[in-house]
Swiss-Prot record:
Protein name: Peptidyl-prolyl cis-trans isomerase pin4
Family the entry assigns: Belongs to the PpiC/parvulin rotamase family. PIN4 subfamily.
GO cellular component, one term: nucleus
Keywords on record: Isomerase, Rotamase
Ranges annotated as biased composition (Basic and acidic residues): 16-31
Originating organism: Neurospora crassa (strain ATCC 24698 / 74-OR23-1A / CBS 708.71 / DSM 1257 / FGSC 987)
Molecular function via GO: DNA binding; peptidyl-prolyl cis-trans isomerase activity
Function: PPIases accelerate the folding of proteins. It catalyzes the cis-trans isomerization of proline imidic peptide bonds in oligopeptides.
Biological process per Gene Ontology, one example term: rRNA processing
Domain PpiC: 36-128
Length: 130
């Protein structure tokens, strides 16, 4: 009889574990689909790591992101690094992964992310999400 009780207990425990796993999987899937589908993004693109580090130091010292972009970026410099509104799936995958994970912020107090892509070194900030 002891063996029967263990078998029943294990069966119930396993079944409960599977149910809990399915519920969690459903919640995670729901969260993924509810995330932002587009972002208003700016970046500073530098071919050389050293130049990216100089730009990063200026931002960390309190310089305006747009001003640093105009001085250092090798792409979109005239627009302060603005790429405008971009939808998920339209950017370089590595860039997109970092950009969509960032919190929104302003050019005067940016929350930044960094990534290296085939294009070079990027410093990224996001101004809006929808």
């Amino acid at each position: 009889m002891g063996k029967d009780k263990k078998a029943s207990g294990s069966g119930s425990g396993s079944k409960g574990g599977k149910d809990a796993g399915n519920k969690d999987a459903g919640k995670d899937a729901g969260k993924a689909s509810k995330g932002a589908q587009s972002i208003n993004v700016r970046h500073i693109l530098c071919e050389k790591h050293g130049k990216k580090e100089e730009a990063l130091a200026k931002i960390r010292d309190g310089a305006d992101f747009g001003a640093v972009a105009r001085e250092y970026s090798e792409d979109k410099a005239r627009t302060g690094g603005s790429l405008g509104w971009k939808q998920k799936g339209t950017l370089d995958p590595e860039f997109e992964k970092v950009a969509f994970a960032l919190e929104t912020s302003s050019t005067s107090s940016p929350k930044i992310g960094e990534v290296k892509t085939q294009f070079g070194y990027h410093i990224i900030m996001v101004e809006g999400k929808k």
